[in-house]
Amino acid sequence: KLNAFQISTGDLLREEISNNSDIGKSIINDMNDGKFVSDEIVNSLIKNVVFDSEKKNKLIFDGYPRSLSQAKNLDILLKDSDQKIDLIFFLNVNKETIMKRIEKRKIIENRSDDDTSTILKRYDTYMDTTKPVLEFYSKNPNFEEIDGSQEIDQITRKINNFLNV
């Protein structure tokens, strides 16, 4: 619908692991332990995407930025590549809903980083590091917070309305 590329940092990182790259080897334990991968590594992967001419002005980031450092890095990368952020939305989902959804995903995808203790660590880390990012972007007039604890079809409708698709 949008003629855009969804860029998931999780997918990029899992691809590095799958390819057995140097980056993949260095991050596998952190990811399996529910830790966030360093900003330096994530930013380098995002930089490659931002400067990909095929994707210019057609990017949708999923799971990035997750820290204030990453948000500031993204601003620099976009400026240096003559791009800008058009819209920002945050899916606000409570811990209980996240746990239920990941338990379902665990059955379907059988991901090694989807055990309960890892999920809880990731959630706590996410909440600690993401709050400053939300404060940073909430000042943007194109920022929208969407209740992510609703049914998926309701969330999809709200996102589509926000994106005008």
PLM features: residue spans?
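A conserved segment at the C-terminal end of the G1
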Residues: 1-3
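ATP-dependent small-molecule kinase phosphotransfer cores
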Residues: 5-76, 80, 108
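Residue-level signature of catalytic and energy-coupling elements of molecular machines
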Residues: 10, 46, 60, 89, ...
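A glycine- and Lys/Arg-enriched "phosphate-lid" helix/loop adjacent to the NTP-binding pocket
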Residues: 14, 28-30, 73-129
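Small/polar loops that bind or transfer phosphate-bearing groups
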Residues: 38, 62-63, 90-91, 147-148
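Small-molecule kinase domains that catalyze NTP-dependent phosphoryl transfer to phosphate-bearing small molecules
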Residues: 41, 45-49, 111-155
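Loop/helix-junction capping segments adjacent to catalytic residues or to phosphate/diphosphate-binding pockets
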Residues: 68, 96, 153
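C-terminal alpha-helix
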Residues: 158-165
